[in-house]
Regions:
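Alpha-helical transmembrane segments in multi-pass membrane proteins
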Residues: 2-5, 54-100, 122-195
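Interfacial transmembrane-helix boundary/kink motif in multi-pass membrane proteins
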Residues: 25-42, 81-91, 111-140, 161-178, ...
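Intrinsically disordered, low-complexity acidic/Q/S/K-rich activation/interaction tracts characteristic
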Residues: 6, 10-15, 44, 116-119, ...
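Membrane-water interface of transmembrane alpha-helices
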Residues: 11-20, 93-115, 186-197
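Intrinsic disorder/low-complexity segments enriched in polar/charged and small flexible residues
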Residues: 94-97, 177, 208, 356, ...
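Transmembrane helix-loop-helix hairpins at the membrane interface
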Residues: 1-30, 46-57, 62-66, 71-82, ...
Length: 390
């Protein structure tokens, strides 16, 4: 619920920016820019403190009260590894905040307007750029933590890592995040502030027309691309998958274990939320390439690997569907792409549960037909090797 409230708050800020842009007096836009500058200055100071203040005594205190199920020594090692990434996170936070403050000046926005279709004079477009920076910041935060988690797994003892991840991975949490994306998209395009519900749906590409040609082409292309990257990754870099496979199993195992509900959540929630926000709201302003790059960036929970290449390719495919058809067609293609492989995971195959990314080995007691499964390192199963997007 917290992430839903946070995303909705950003959407409301963009809605107020729509009102400020419609005022004849520019003082409202200046006031909005001043508030944004103050907020980003606070964020920059917090990042600087995180980068320079030592956190030596925290692992003992946090590990003692975490109740993660691991032995105290392993829990302490886990938190030492996680906290070791905080200076990097602080540095990223500081520099992202500096970039955001610079974007409050007219000339950087005018330069960007030559690359992407934004209006450098509109406050709402400035906030949209800041929203993109927030996505980059949280993605960097996730990437650094994932690298720390992988180092723990490589040491051979998860130290309560599985408990820590599983407690934050629920069907309800995934739906809350994706519904937050929907709320952010609608408020971001000015629902109730600058557009009626019908106008907002039209702006987001929620139109009745449905292109079966683009739908089927996107699903087939996405699945084919996923299998191709999986084969290449298995053959060229098999060792790089081991830790990500284990981490992915921890992330998605609790959702997959819920059966059909989990499969539908993985399939439908991301199709609804991610397509509405990225292809519906962002793409008309940021363009296909920049939006697809942002889409790949938010999936850094899989680490910096070939997974991101596959996610970028899938994003470009869905972006073309949005451009040539509409968002609902892209949404259906995304949901189908996810659902195919989420269902395969539920019924027992060894399944890459990401946009063409790492294989999630399903535990033996989940497998319906374990004899039909081929090791992801040994090769691709003859019938199917599913992938799905979280």
């Amino acid at each position: 619920m917290g992430i839903f409230i946070g995303l909705t708050f950003i959407g409301l800020a963009m809605g107020l920016a729509h009102i400020a842009d419609r005022q004849a007096d520019a003082v409202w836009r200046y006031l909005g820019s001043f508030v944004l500058a103050a907020l980003w200055l606070i964020i920059a100071l917090c990042g600087m403190m995180l980068a320079v203040v030592p956190l030596v005594d925290l692992p003992d205190n946090i590990a003692a009260g975490a109740n993660l199920g691991g032995d105290p020594g392993s829990n302490q090692a886990l938190f030492e590894s996680l906290l070791s990434s905080f200076p990097k996170i602080g540095a990223w936070t500081f520099w992202v905040a500096i970039v955001a403050i610079l974007l409050l000046l007219p000339w950087p926005r005018r330069l960007l307007a030559r690359l992407i279709p934004i209006d450098p004079e509109r406050l709402v477009h400035t906030i949209a750029l800041h929203g993109a920076l927030v996505l980059v910041l949280f993605s960097a935060f996730t990437a650094f933590l994932v690298q720390s988690m992988l180092s723990v797994l490589e040491a051979g003892d998860d130290g309560g890592l599985q408990t820590l991840i599983e407690d934050g991975t629920t069907v309800g949490g995934l739906w809350a995040q994706q519904l937050g994306f929907v709320a952010l998209a609608f408020l971001g395009v000015g629902l109730f502030f600058a557009r009626t519900p019908v106008e907002a749906m039209r702006r987001l590409g929620w139109t009745r027309a449905f292109s079966w040609r683009w739908y089927l082409g996107a699903v087939a292309s996405g699945v084919g691309m996923a299998l191709l990257v999986q084969v290449v990754w298995n053959r060229l870099l098999p060792d790089s998958q081991a830790g990500i496979e284990q981490l992915s199993e921890m992330m998605f195992g609790p959702i997959v274990k819920t059966g059909l509900v989990g499969a539908l959540t993985i399939g439908l929630a991301a199709g609804l939320g991610e397509e509405t926000l990225f292809r519906g709201a962002m793409q008309p302003r940021f363009g296909i390439v920049f939006t697809s790059m942002l889409f790949a960036v938010i999936h850094t929970q899989y680490g910096v690997s070939l997974a991101l290449v596959q996610i970028l390719a899938i994003a470009l495919i869905f972006g073309l569907v949005r451009q040539r058809a509409n968002t609902l067609t892209a949404m259906a293609a995304h949901a189908t792409y996810n659902l195919i492989f989420a269902l395969a995971a539920v019924i027992g195959s060894q399944t890459p549960l990401w946009h063409g990314g790492p294989v999630v080995p399903i535990p033996e007691d989940w497998k319906a037909t374990p004899t039909a499964v081929v090791s992801p390192v040994d090769g691709i199963p003859p019938a199917m090797t599913p992938t799905a997007a979280p």
